[in-house]
Amino acid sequence: MRTVHSLKELRTILRGYRQQGKTIGLVPTMGNLHEGHISLVRKAAEASDIVVTSIFVNPMQFGANEDLDTYPRTLVEDQEKLAAAGNTLVFAPGVEEIYPEGLANQTKVVVPEVSEGHCGASRPGHFEGVATVVTMLFNMVQPDIAVFGEKDFQQLAVIRKLARDLMIPVEVIGAPTVREDDGLAKSSRNGYLSEQERGIAPVVFRTLRHTADQLAQGRTDYSILEQEARDALSEAGLRPDYFNIVNSLTLKPASKDDRELTLLVAAFLGTTRLIDNLSITR
């Protein structure tokens, strides 16, 4: 496995692989890798000959009071995990390589509708930053396939739309959420949780499952179900950001006729923001 830091190096190596007829898969990450990330790498390896994992803590997708400065940078440990998972190439650029003229002068990609609401409402500018850097990575790597986790459900929808709308020839693949034994979705930010908070955190997934069970039993009073879920989170000691029942394709509020539903949740536990989701077919 090789690690490169410049776009020039990246393109030179990938040109050689393409001349050999190899297919290329991309797994974009911000590093601080866990088993969820590694599952994406394995999925990419199943679907392509060469796997490129990018490690870049993207400043454009962080808000003013978020954890850009404290987000863990663990490149050496990440490299060890990736090598063991069958990754081929690590692209770990610095900020200057991606944004040579600075963020203020950077062309930005805005994905309408699907990026609005939910995390888009709570984190203004976040999906603009995600869409911009992912579009750049698609252009830099020119992958045949790219793998993203379903844990970030709205992000996956944003990326699928941008690839479709901008006619980028890449197959965007979603990979199932990897969970701890108690149901907590694996996340780089779980490391911020105290021992006490870690014991409380599984209530997020339990609340999703309980609400999904209610829907499976035929309930369609979505606003009441959403409030019940927020109340359950609050009673457990979390501060709900949102709990929304949406159409799985549009991410708009679900109607009684919708058959494909997704439950989206974000909640603070202490200072840590946890997100999760669960999709069902009725």
UniProtKB/Swiss-Prot annotation:
It comes from Marinobacter nauticus (strain ATCC 700491 / DSM 11845 / VT8). The keyword ATP-binding applies. SUPFAM superfamilies: Nucleotidylyl transferase. GO terms for biological process: pantothenate biosynthetic process. Belongs to the pantothenate synthetase family. HAMAP family: PanC. NCBIfam families: panC (TIGR00018). Homodimer. It is found in: Cytoplasm. Beta-alanine binds at residue 61. Keywords: ATP-binding, Cytoplasm, Ligase, Nucleotide-binding, Pantothenate biosynthesis. Disulfide bonds: none annotated. PANTHER family: CYTIDYLATE KINASE/PANTOATE-BETA-ALANINE LIGASE, PANTOATE--BETA-ALANINE LIGASE. It is an enzyme of class 6 (ligase). Catalyzes the condensation of pantoate with beta-alanine in an ATP-dependent reaction via a pantoyl-adenylate intermediate. It catalyses: (R)-pantoate + beta-alanine + ATP = (R)-pantothenate + AMP + diphosphate + H(+). This is Pantothenate synthetase. The reaction proceeds by a bi uni uni bi ping pong mechanism. Pathway: Cofactor biosynthesis; (R)-pantothenate biosynthesis; (R)-pantothenate from (R)-pantoate and beta-alanine: step 1/1. Gene3D superfamilies: HUPs, Pantoate-beta-alanine ligase, C-terminal domain. One of its GO terms (cellular component) is cytosol. (R)-pantoate binds at residues 61, 155. Its EC number is 6.3.2.1. The active site is at 37 (proton donor). One of its GO terms (molecular function) is ATP binding. Coiled coil: none annotated.
